[in-house]
From Swiss-Prot:
Family matches, as Gene3D superfamilies: Nucleic acid-binding proteins, P-loop containing nucleotide triphosphate hydrolases, Probable gtpase engc, domain 3
Lineage, top ranks: Bacteria, Pseudomonadati, Pseudomonadota, Gammaproteobacteria, Enterobacterales
Any one annotated GO CC term: cytoplasm
Compartments in which it is found: Cytoplasm
Pfam entry (one): RsgA_GTPase
Family that this chain belongs to: Belongs to the TRAFAC class YlqF/YawG GTPase family. RsgA subfamily.
Domain CP-type G as annotated: residue spans: 104-273
Name of encoding gene: rsgA
Binding residue positions for Zn(2+): C297, C302, H304, C310
Record's cofactor remark: Binds 1 zinc ion per subunit.
Region of interest (Disordered), residue spans: 1-27
Binding site for GTP: N160, K161, I162, D163, G214, Q215, S216, G217, V218, G219, K220, S221, S222
Protein name in the entry: Small ribosomal subunit biogenesis GTPase RsgA
Function (record text): One of several proteins that assist in the late maturation steps of the functional core of the 30S ribosomal subunit. Helps release RbfA from mature subunits. May play a role in the assembly of ribosomal proteins into the subunit. Circularly permuted GTPase that catalyzes slow GTP hydrolysis, GTPase activity is stimulated by the 30S ribosomal subunit.
Cofactor or coenzyme needed: Zn(2+)
Amino acid sequence: MSKNKLSKGQQRRVNANHQRRLKTSAEKADYDDNLFGEPAEGIVISRLGMHADVESADGEVHRCNIRRTIRSLVTGDRVVWRPGKAAAEGVNVKGIVEAVHERTSVLTRPDFYDGVKPIAANIDQIVIVSAILPELSLNIIDRYLVGCETLQVEPLIVLNKIDLLDDEGMDFVNEQMDIYRNIGYRVLMVSSHTQDGLKPLEEALTGRISIFAGQSGVGKSSLLNALLGLQNEILTNDVSNVSGLGQHTTTAARLYHFPHGGDVIDSPGVREFGLWHLEPEQITQGFVEFHDYLGHCKYRDCKHDADPGCAIREAVENGAIAETRFENYHRILESMAQVKTRKNFSDTDD
């Protein structure tokens, strides 16, 4: 997930792919303006290949074609669209998307072939869902937080399945979550099974477009089903009794409306995303508690590891930075280096 500009080589590949698509359809006439009504505002609730489902101001959903001049269209985009004139006469004629408004945010994921690929737009917050089962992974939480900081979208940490905790377990988990509360992150404890804690979560979702992110098996779909109501049920699979891991079942990204207000964009593509396309400096900036210490290390090229005079390591030793966060920072950097060894994401011929 990133707001970084593509490298020259990546941009060349994107442009080349775009030109090939244009060449294929060069001899096809674009849609006749006389077939469509007056322009109107709408929001893309799903992108389906060469078409998009657009919701109009009155809440109706219209299947639309997309002008060839529109190079990128994803769920959450605010658009100008026009209905097919024959639609008013009861004939099923697609509308057309004419233009896309400027995005306030773009969620992307790294792609080995096209650089970074946009998958959702205009997101206000990312709900990071974790759970005590199959495993409470602070490393996964930290990875998502780095993504949120890079995108500059507000995160909300939600710990699901608290009904499985006894008092001692709850104390331990609260101690772990205090690591995040103490550096300014919001944390909610909920149970999609008993619906404990759902009211504060509903309030946090109201008036915003959110996405739910997290590893498989933490109960994202069950939580969304509880929040959306059965009429909008998102498919889900129970966690495997053998592996303890869940399975993804939704496909294309789609925007849903919460009954209490607010929206969610859901799909496997927005639930899990990588960081390997980011630079190490971006990972460092993604740890908010590091900011006060950056620039104060003894050496300008400090790697914040075993370097002498490292201000961040000293803060860890003094208890000002949580040791688990510091360890996860280096785990993320190490995993990025391993992936980039297998696939060099950045171009070397520029």
